[in-house]
Amino acid sequence: MRDLILVGGGLANGLIAWRLRQRYPQLNLLLIEAGEQPGGNHTWSFHEDDLTPGQHAWLAPLVAHAWPGYEVQFPDLRRRLARGYYSITSERFAEALHQALGENIWLNCSVSEVLPNSVRLANGEALLAGAVIDGRGVTASSAMQTGYQLFLGQQWRLTQPHGLTVPILMDATVAQQQGYRFVYTLPLSADTLLIEDTRYANVPQRDDNALRQTVTDYAHSKGWQLAQLEREETGCLPITLAGDIQALWADAPGVPRSGMRAGLFHPTTGYSLPLAVALADAIADSPRLGSVPLYQLTRQFAERHWRRQGFFRLLNRMLFLAGREENRWRVMQRFYGLPEPTVERFYAGRLSLFDKARILTGKPPVPLGEAWRAALNHFPDRRDKG
């Protein structure tokens, strides 16, 4: 019998395994992944102030790229922010986990049932453990009302250097389509870029062929000559408007959860790495790793996060439900004009009361009446439950 089985080899469970291996190298754990490698095909990014110095230290071997700042671009605002920005690639992530866990990673392994102390594989085999953590990604739930962040990114090698020294996190000078749209660009080397077309949309419908064309068009508009496509990634992330966190957890009683499965992501940006790191630390610090204490720990962690993020869900309702779709960029342009510490605390999910007042006061970027109606539009019974 294993001490711990982690079902799903994505970011959250991978970081839990990585941290536990650092802290407790003799722990008998197993990571089960349905795909061909842990981490799938993704790029996870985060801001310098999202993590503590200690967290930066234990995560450092996984970081593939680091920059001293980043830029944002809007029709009436162009700004460079001077705080660090970092990215982990799924290739680096998988390599590190294989080195740390060895044969304790099972790939191409489908699971049919997850219980607090056991896992049943698709072939019928049953595995027992002191605890099981379900980290198989986001699942559709009637307990949540969401918008969506849709994206397609392509990693291109260029014919010549691109000249970028820092990422462009948002270029919203592009034509606005399907809600709020921007292009996200990471300079991975002197002649390699990850270019990602992103839309905040009301429905989870993504036209990949159209997005491939817009990525190509954007590169050409910048004078970047594309030589070789090295990789492509796609995604559809939930952007939470309102919901009931207790109902979200009710469909699998007693089973500890992690990551998107637990509702652990930034409600507005969709970033999930900072919370995955924090949960990994909390689990590694726990004196007991049985199913009951881990269920209590992970559920309480998720519920605390939910209660703290009500302001972000309010902002999301204003972004998705107020004003014309083609003008939603104005909300983000106004936000990025705020003082840099406020922007960094926003990404870290640690806004002060003064920060919240800064965001809500001043000339509204969407019609005031519509903004307040959207802010008060709760789901499903006009109570945003914590």
From Swiss-Prot:
Q: Which GO terms describe its biological process?
A: carotenoid biosynthetic process
List required co-factors: FAD
Task: State its Enzyme Commission number(s).
Answer: 5.5.1.19
Instruction: Report the SS bond pairs.
Output: none
Note the InterPro entries from the entry.
CrtY, FAD/NAD-bd_sf, Lycopene_cyclase_b/e
Coiled coil spans: none
Q: What is an example of a GO molecular function annotated in this UniProt entry? A: lycopene beta cyclase activity
The residues the record assigns to binding NAD(+) are 3-33
Q: Does the keyword Transcription apply?
A: no
Q: Which UniProt keywords apply?
A: Carotenoid biosynthesis, FAD, Flavoprotein, Isomerase, NAD, NADP
Record keyword Isomerase present: yes
Lineage top rank: taxon: Bacteria
Q: Which Pfam families match?
A: Lycopene_cycl
Enzymatic reactions: a carotenoid psi-end group = a carotenoid beta-end derivative; all-trans-lycopene = gamma-carotene; gamma-carotene = all-trans-beta-carotene
Q: In which pathway does it act?
A: Carotenoid biosynthesis; beta-carotene biosynthesis
Q: What does the similarity note say? A: Belongs to the lycopene cyclase family.
The function of this protein is: Catalyzes the double cyclization reaction which converts lycopene to beta-carotene.
Name of the protein in question? Lycopene beta-cyclase
| Species of the source | Pseudescherichia vulneris (Escherichia vulneris)
